[in-house]
Amino acid sequence: MVKVAVTGALGRMGSGIIKTITETDGLDVVAAIDIPNHPKKGLDIGELTGLGKIGVLLSTSDELEDVLKESGAEVLVDFTAAAPCVNTAKTASKLGVNLVIGTTGFTPEQRAEMEKAISENKVAATISQNYAVGVNIFFKTLELLAQKLGDYDIEILEMHHKFKKDAPSGTALRAAEIIQNNLNRDSNLIYGREGITGERTKEEICIHALRGGDIVGDHTVIFTTEGERLELSHRVTSRQSLVSGAIRAIQFVADKKEGIYNTFDVLDLN
């Protein structure tokens, strides 16, 4: 039985992961953690997420080290925000706890700080902007399209719910990274357009971020040239697709000794 701690336990992703862990053979929720001074601290996380009592009380991130030690957690799952996630990763890795990280919005410095802690403490971690299986097939397909349609104009469009705090999305940035790594030409990433921009240059890859309503996550990459347009789209209609992917990542990383992995590793797409 793999003992799992979940941060952001009452968030949209955290609560979904907790529910699915309780339905998954071989996994057990041993700690549920949320922000300091949370008003529901000390209440049963099962009752808070509609499962009924499961015997795990909500704790807070200011007591993370003690919670991880007392619970014996082997894997910690973090879908929160960049700054607290870095601190969580540093604490967990110091204690030898493996990680599944789905948080987005890291600065390069934050990402480097987190990866340094993981490497120095010789734990294993999967880090991904999107754990949905379909979106990773989307990423893999982008490798081929960028290689074969590298002389086309390329634009990226992403849409999310009005509550999303970072833009562009981590998934859109990952798509852009994959495209740039597979183009046989120079490229320049830009974000939206405004005013008199002049003609579009061949090097431009532009990301457009839309926000509104309850959109879980839509991503489209458009390859266009004179006479034709190819669009590759992925749409998440339920967070359960992300939750299911995170569960796979927990199972994958649980028995790994050390290393930093991504969802291509989890899904054997490399």
Swiss-Prot record:
GO biological process: diaminopimelate biosynthetic process; lysine biosynthetic process via diaminopimelate
Pathway field: Amino-acid biosynthesis; L-lysine biosynthesis via DAP pathway; (S)-tetrahydrodipicolinate from L-aspartate: step 4/4
GO molecular function, one term: NADP binding
Subcellular localization(s) per the UniProt record: Cytoplasm
Top-level taxon of origin: Archaea
EC number(s) stated in the UniProt entry for this protein: 1.17.1.8
Protein family per UniProt: Belongs to the DapB family.
Function text: Catalyzes the conversion of 4-hydroxy-tetrahydrodipicolinate (HTPA) to tetrahydrodipicolinate.
Protein name: 4-hydroxy-tetrahydrodipicolinate reductase
